[in-house]
């Protein structure tokens, strides 16, 4: 069953009220097949606002389980030992490499799926609760030090105020440092998404055309000087619809050029600025749930990302 994702910001012609359609999934019982349970789990994930990528990954993992046990296997007959044997099969006997990161996600899938079945009363206990979770840690993201941020902003301000005015570097970098946007989100900004009615408190509406990603839509504050910088930028570049009417590669060149002038030898990327923004917000006392929403991350993705941000923002040991 496919469920429609309600957009955060209604578009023209759309009503403001929206009621979720009733579930069409039949009530599950201990005798229900694994296939039926997976269908019900899909409905649950949609209504819990799991991201499209998370839903796709979890369903892929459960398809592997169904191939191993059989689609018609009653869920009450899938015990802890069956799940352990399945994980051993994935690691050593499937014939396809299973990276630590993939293995860790598949354990997470089993835990989330069977915990849901137990909480719904479909099965008496959770067979995945005893599985040992071995999370695959990603390397700590690179962030800018405070001195590097200062050097970067000095360069962008000089370019904006020099003989040959170029406001784009300052607009781009202050935007990313303040909002923590992804590259895709940055490229999708339309001029109509920016509200400068109150210049010192300008607002950006992060929107998605893809209905599957509309749970990521959000309303973000912009830097106090954004409206002034935007005015200079619009006069210089005169974009018609989107804020940045160029290729992503073009903006990457802008970041690389400014980083070189600022003496940042490791270079500069959208992701590095995004993580720098997150660390600075965390240090400033932004609550964890608000920071997750600001970054547009799912609860599953946030588990590891929060640990990394907390470590980078905290004091040295």
Which sequence ranges carry the predicted segments?
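N-terminal core-binding DNA-recognition domain of tyrosine recombinases/integrases
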Residues: 21-27, 39-140, 159
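Alpha-helix N-cap/helix-start motif at helix boundaries, enriched for small hydrophobics
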Residues: 55, 110, 172-173, 180, ...
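DNA breakage-rejoining catalytic core of tyrosine-based enzymes
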Residues: 123, 136-153, 213-224, 239
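Catalytic-site neighborhood detector that most strongly recognizes the C-terminal catalytic loop/helix
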Residues: 143, 295-317
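Basic, Lys/Arg- and aromatic-enriched nucleic-acid-binding interface segment
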Residues: 151-183
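Short basic/aromatic active-site micro-motif
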Residues: 167-168, 247-248, 265-285, 295-301
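Conserved tyrosine-mediated DNA breakage-rejoining catalytic core shared by Y-recombinases
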Residues: 188-226
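Active-site/catalytic core of tyrosine-dependent DNA strand-transfer enzymes
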Residues: 221-265, 277
